[in-house]
Amino acid sequence: MYQAKRERMIGKKILGERYVTVSEAAEIMYNRAQIGELSYEQGCALDYLQKFAKLDKEEAKKLVEELISLGIDEKTAVKIADILPEDLDDLRAIYYKRELPENAEEILEIVRKYI
């Protein structure tokens, strides 16, 4: 979950928080790198995000919106967009503590458009 102004220091507060895809997190970190030098940990995070982002930010955002329109909660939709499950077994891994939704095949059809 991305939190704007996450630091809890004097004069800083959390402005809001929302779930973001790996692609969007990579863009956030890249933009932060343009402002100033990243710490070692931030640099490693940026490298990881760039390696594992499977879609660009706009594609991922569109996929999440399509999944939410099917009634999937935002957190799960973001996870599906990050993993891009190819079959029911992959989708079951995301829903490991819950039952697969009845529209699981429809979810996979939508995801396949982005693979």
From Swiss-Prot:
<dbReference type="GO" id="GO:0000428">
    <property type="term" value="C:DNA-directed RNA polymerase complex"/>
</dbReference>
<dbReference type="GO" id="GO:0000166">
    <property type="term" value="F:nucleotide binding"/>
</dbReference>
<comment type="similarity">
    <text>Belongs to the eukaryotic RPB4 RNA polymerase subunit family.</text>
</comment>
<keyword id="KW-0240">DNA-directed RNA polymerase</keyword>
<keyword id="KW-0808">Transferase</keyword>
<keyword id="KW-0804">Transcription</keyword>
<dbReference type="InterPro" id="IPR010924">
    <property type="entry name" value="Rpo4"/>
</dbReference>
<dbReference type="InterPro" id="IPR010997">
    <property type="entry name" value="HRDC-like_sf"/>
</dbReference>
<protein>
    <recommendedName>
        <fullName>DNA-directed RNA polymerase subunit Rpo4</fullName>
        <ecNumber>2.7.7.6</ecNumber>
    </recommendedName>
</protein>
<keyword id="KW-0548">Nucleotidyltransferase</keyword>
<dbReference type="GO" id="GO:0005737">
    <property type="term" value="C:cytoplasm"/>
</dbReference>
<dbReference type="GO" id="GO:0003899">
    <property type="term" value="F:DNA-directed RNA polymerase activity"/>
</dbReference>
<comment type="subunit">
    <text>Part of the RNA polymerase complex. Forms a stalk with Rpo7 that extends from the main structure.</text>
</comment>
<dbReference type="GO" id="GO:0006352">
    <property type="term" value="P:DNA-templated transcription initiation"/>
</dbReference>
<dbReference type="Pfam" id="PF03874">
    <property type="entry name" value="RNA_pol_Rpb4"/>
</dbReference>
<dbReference type="InterPro" id="IPR005574">
    <property type="entry name" value="Rpb4/RPC9"/>
</dbReference>
<keyword id="KW-0963">Cytoplasm</keyword>
<comment type="function">
    <text>DNA-dependent RNA polymerase (RNAP) catalyzes the transcription of DNA into RNA using the four ribonucleoside triphosphates as substrates. This subunit is less well bound than the others.</text>
</comment>
<dbReference type="InterPro" id="IPR044876">
    <property type="entry name" value="HRDC_dom_sf"/>
</dbReference>
